[in-house]
Amino acid sequence: MVSKIRVLGGTPLRGEVTVRGAKNLVPKAMVAALLSAEQSKLRNVPLIRDVDVVSDLLRMHGVTVDYDQEAGVLAMTPGSINLPEDSVEMDTLAGSSRIPILFAGPLLHSLGEAFIPDLGGCHIGSRPVNFHLRVLEDFGARRIQEAAGMHLIAEKPLKAKPVHLPYPSVGATEQTLLAAVRAEGIT
């Protein structure tokens, strides 16, 4: 890797550069498509691995995903949302991303249950999902630890409530937003 770059000025830059969308936002916006029965479209979608992983996970849950990579347009149409029957394929996808935990809130709203496989995808150290689970439990979900992951059940519609995290967590905040959007009450 280059340790420094030297930039020499004096010549105006000309031309055009196409910049694709925010790589950290798009996978979460894709998960949010589970919150509606209507088609969701994202434009300016970047060509990143997480888009492929989330597309595959959405398809496994019954969502039709059409991605025009050249145009950068991604259309997601929820059909009959369901829990995947193939936990092996889901495990394979989960091993390359931490996104599956964010499916929990939307699936609890749509199905009353969610299965979250053991998660991978992090090279910066341990990043437990206990804050995610606490938010979902505070909203009324119940969790059952299974050999392959976590089964979450909401026997009644989720109920929003104030959330206080012990310290800032981007993922738990995203989970809170995805779970609270259709929950009864105010978060």
Model-derived regions, located:
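Structural preference for solvent-exposed beta-strand-turn elements
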Residues: 1-187
